[in-house]
A protein has these predicted regions:
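Pyridoxal 5′-phosphate
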Residues: 1-289
């Protein structure tokens, strides 16, 4: 357990990188062009320290380009880290196919006696509690999830680590969490996380139907009443609780303030980036201007 999804993401990526540094192998990391800021900022740090970070291109609908991913992988690639559900668009990435690709690469490297291992990390923060997550089908080595996304207490998150995967800890001390994360364990927050997960399991199907019904109404009513409204992602490839919309002839912040006066909450970007009045990297990667 960790304190946040940001910490889990950092532990996953830095932990893999640092545990293999002594062998001087694995200088290439691959991620997508629409990751959370905790991944993007970390990738910038990796590049400053001599690592090559390759980013997978996106389709116009926001899905990762699997053909491009195959092209980016080389014998020095040590880690692939991809967000499961995008926090801005809600797109669900085809990560079972990525997991299968990683399995094939391992088999190929074994045959060719390539010493660099390859790991697969999934940032499932937005997927957790919204869609079914099957670790075996995903074939991932590491997976991030957190409490507050399922209405549990803030300050608790997890990092799933596949048996046999070695991580160098970020925090050194008393050897808590099997030596991976030293620090006094936040038992109340973790218990709340567990309880929220229990409740979530029983409510997930009901909530999915509720969100789908609301999403369908929004997608029907808005175009009927407003000209120049566009839904950036088809509903069949996203979670229904996230809708990404753009409008002609109105500035984003003005729309946010106007809707707020009517007690309707919207955002011009993710919670982590909405304070910065810059274009969304995720939407730019989809070809939107």
């Amino acid at each position: 357990f960790t304190s946040s999804a940001t910490e889990s993401n950092n532990l996953a990526i830095k932990g893999i990188i640092m545990s293999n540094m002594k062998n001087n192998i694995g200088k290439n990391v691959i991620t997508s062009s629409q990751e959370h800021s905790s991944i993007n900022s970390l990738c910038g740090w990796l590049e400053k320290h001599g690592f090559k970070v390759s980013k997978i291109s996106s389709t116009n609908e926001g899905l990762i380009n699997l053909a491009n991913l195959k092209e980016l992988i080389n014998d020095d690639t040590i880690l692939i880290s991809i967000i499961y559900v995008n926090n801005e668009t809600g797109v669900i990435q085809p990560l079972e196919k990525v997991g299968e690709l990683v399995r094939e690469i391992r088999q190929d490297r074994l045959k060719r006696n390539i010493q660099t291992p390859i790991y697969f990390h999934i940032d499932a923060t937005q997927a957790f509690g919204k869609i079914s997550i099957d670790i075996a089908k995903l074939n991932c080595d590491l997976l991030t999830a957190c409490s507050h996304k399922i209405y549990g207490p803030k300050g608790a998150a997890l990092l799933y680590i596949k048996k046999g995967v070695q991580l160098e800890p970020l925090i050194h001390g008393g050897g808590h969490e099997f030596g991976i994360r030293s620090s006094t364990v936040n038992v109340p927050a973790i218990f709340g996380f567990f309880k929220a997960f229990e409740l979530c399991q029983g409510l997930m199907k009901r909530d999915y139907k509720k969100y789908t019904s609301f999403s369908n109404k929004i997608m029907k009513i808005l175009p009927q009443n407003i000209k120049g409204v566009y839904f950036n992602v088809p509903k069949n490839i996203r979670v229904p609780n996230i809708i990404n919309i753009r409008f002609d002839y109105i500035e984003g912040e003005s729309l946010v303030y106007m809707l707020d006066t009517h007690r309707i909450g919207v955002s011009t970007g993710s919670a982590c980036a909405s304070a910065f009045l810059t274009a969304s990297d995720t939407l730019i990667s989809m070809g939107l201007k």
